[in-house]
Structure formats: structure tokens, C-alpha cells
């Protein structure tokens, strides 16, 4: 489709984005930017998690470094995040005075009782990185994941950086761009990513190694609410399957139905808050809501679970939040 597209001496090969499925508009915009050598200082890749935003960002930077062509050496360095001119910023947990990236938290046993954040000191590091001269690339490259997880101070610092972008290239990957400051969105070139059809999802999942995708589809066939939660996102389905498997079997069985007595509610609140990390608890709420919505149950129950989610996100003590919510659900 894009083979041979060239302008100003830069030819963009089709193979560069061959792994990106179901995103023709986003792919066309990125190919045109490379082919015309007209890059914005900041991009906002918006759309659901798990539909190719991160992959597109990596291939876009690879195209920049490789003159529009697939560049295996640069690809490896970018994917391993060890390129000297790449800074990858993601939400962090504050653990014993250290900031632990979300991607590393589980492997080193960091508690995830509270949601991770993009912090002011991370944005300051980002600004310093973009201000320095790149070592091997035409410009400094920054990928910022989940910018909607920024606190107010971090968001204001990022806005100041966007007002004076210098010669760097910043890519924001956001599943909730509406939660960003309007002034941040307006200073970025938006590239929208959409949900995939089920056929496209199956094609993507079938290419995963070790039959991971096939196993996920088998589980989703037995539990269709997982496919509904994924809503056109292969990556989201894999994450829902991971979270499903991470919940202890005995607790998962008890979560199949809402409690009917105060004793059941209090016992379930205790076990959920003690046995599950914060991200697992939020997932249980989403899973419950999907089941309740499918069953056309009372809307007040869905609203009560919405309040529970907000309480957990606002750092209310988890056991107390679950006790209040589950007791209220008995009479709903």
C-alpha cells in the first residue's frame, strides 16, 4: 500500500509497519510524516490499550532512525529501551523512597495497592533529556505512557515543555486523552487508533508465540464477558486473561455472585482487599459490571460499583471501601 512512497529523498517501505493491523488511517499519517520529513515536535497516540499504539510508536521511531526503512539493529535497541537517545517514561510506584516503573513492579514484588503515577520528577527528567544534544540520532526521542496518570504538577511541567519543545520528538500514548489538559492536547499532533474487528483480533492473537493467543481465545469462548471487556483490543483480551488467571480459584468462584447477607459481604470484602492487589481489585469491578450489565440487572448496582472504583482510585482504605459497597449492594 505504501511501498515506494517518497518525498524529499526519504522512501518509506511497507514492511516498516507490517505488524500493525487494523489501523490504516494511523499508519497512513505516520508514513506520510516520514516520507515528507515533516515531523511534529509532539504526537498524541490516542485510542484503547492493546490495539497497536506502542508498536506504532516504536516502528515510527525506527523509521526515523532508519531513513524510512526497517532497521533491525535500531529496532532491537528501541524495543530493549537501551538506545542512548530514547527515554521511555511510564507511571511509577513509590516504593521505599524509590520510583519503580509499572513494568518492573511485579517482578520485584512491589505492592500495587494504589495506582501508579507519572510524577513531577519524571517530567523534569524528560525536559532535561529533550534539552540536551542527541548522541546518535537527529533528535532526542521520548515516549510517555499513560500521561493521564500525571498529577497536576507534572501536567503543568509537561505543558511548559511542550511550549518550548526544542528539537526533540515526544510521543504520548494515552487511552484516555479526555483526561489530559486541553492545552496539552492542542500542542500535540493527534493520531487516533481504533478498536479492531473480531476477525482482525483473531488474526493478531494467532500470531502470538507459544499458542498464547489461542489459549486466550479458548478461555474467552468459555467466558464471553472477557471478550466483551476486551472490546476490540487484542492486548486488552490478553490482559483480562492474565488478571482472570491471577485471581485465586476459590475467590473467583465466590465472585461469580453478589453476596446476599451482611456476613457474606464483610467476609468477601476482607478477602478481596487482603488477597488482591489494587489492579486486580479494579479489574474485578470491571468484570462484575460487565456481568451485571449483560444480565440487565438493576442500574443502581452498576452505579454503586462505579463509586467503589472511584473510592479505590482516590486511595480510600480498600477494605473499608469494599465493605461499604458490598453492604449497599445487598439491598440494591
State the predicted function of each range.
Residues 142-145, 158, 168-175:
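Structural recognition of the conserved hydrophobic beta-strand(s) that form the central parallel beta-sheet
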Residues 72-98, 178:
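AAA+/P-loop NTPase substrate/partner-engagement loops
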Residues 2-78, 131, 167-169, 174-332:
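Charged, glycine-rich active-site and insertion segments that engage polyanionic ligands
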Residues 29-34, 99, 103-141, 149, ...:
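Conserved alpha-helical scaffold flanking the Walker A/P-loop in AAA+ ATPase domains
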Residues 40-46, 83-91, 133:
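Conserved ASCE/P-loop NTPase catalytic core
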Residues 146-150, 165, 177:
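Conserved Walker B
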Amino acid at each position: 500500500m505504501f511501498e515506494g512512497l517518497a518525498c524529499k529523498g526519504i522512501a518509506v517501505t511497507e514492511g516498516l509497519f507490517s505488524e500493525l493491523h487494523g489501523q490504516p488511517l494511523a499508519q497512513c499519517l505516520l508514513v506520510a510524516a516520514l516520507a515528507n520529513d515533516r515531523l511534529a515536535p509532539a504526537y498524541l497516540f490516542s485510542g484503547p490499550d492493546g490495539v497497536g499504539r506502542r508498536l506504532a510508536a516504536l516502528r515510527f521511531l525506527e523509521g526515523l532512525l532508519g531513513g524510512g526503512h526497517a532497521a533491525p539493529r535500531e529496532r532491537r535497541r528501541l524495543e530493549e529501551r537501551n538506545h542512548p537517545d530514547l527515554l521511555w517514561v511510564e507511571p511509577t510506584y513509590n516504593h521505599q523512597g524509590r520510583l519503580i516503573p509499572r513494568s518492573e513492579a511485579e517482578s520485584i514484588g512491589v505492592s500495587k495497592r494504589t495506582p501508579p503515577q507519572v510524577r513531577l520528577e519524571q517530567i523534569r527528567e524528560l525536559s532535561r533529556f529533550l534539552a540536551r544534544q542527541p548522541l546518535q540520532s537527529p533528535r532526542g526521542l521520548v515516549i510517555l505512557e499513560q500521561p493521564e496518570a500525571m498529577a497536576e504538577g507534572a501536567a503543568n511541567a509537561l505543558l511548559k515543555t511542550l511550549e518550548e519543545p526544542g528539537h526533540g520528538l515526544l510521543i504520548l500514548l494515552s487511552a484516555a486523552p479526555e483526561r489530559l489538559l486541553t492545552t496539552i492536547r492542542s500542542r500535540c499532533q493527534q493520531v487516533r487508533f481504533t478498536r479492531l474487528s473480531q476477525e482482525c483480533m483473531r488474526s493478531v492473537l494467532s500470531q502470538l508465540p507459544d499458542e498464547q493467543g489461542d489459549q486466550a481465545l479458548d478461555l474467552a469462548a468459555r467466558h464471553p464477558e472477557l471478550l466483551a471487556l476486551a472490546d476490540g483490543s487484542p492486548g486488552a483480551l490478553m490482559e483480562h486473561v492474565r488478571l482472570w488467571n491471577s485471581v485465586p480459584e476459590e475467590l473467583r468462584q465466590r465472585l461469580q455472585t453478589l453476596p446476599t447477607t451482611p456476613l457474606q459481604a464483610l467476609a468477601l470484602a476482607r478477602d478481596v482487599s487482603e488477597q488482591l492487589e489494587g489492579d486486580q481489585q479494579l479489574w474485578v469491578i470491571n468484570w462484575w459490571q460487565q456481568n451485571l450489565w449483560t444480565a440487565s440487572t438493576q442500574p443502581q448496582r452498576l452505579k454503586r460499583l462505579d463509586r467503589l472504583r472511584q473510592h479505590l482510585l482516590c486511595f480510600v482504605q480498600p477494605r473499608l471501601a469494599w465493605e461499604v459497597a458490598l453492604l449497599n449492594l445487598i439491598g440494591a
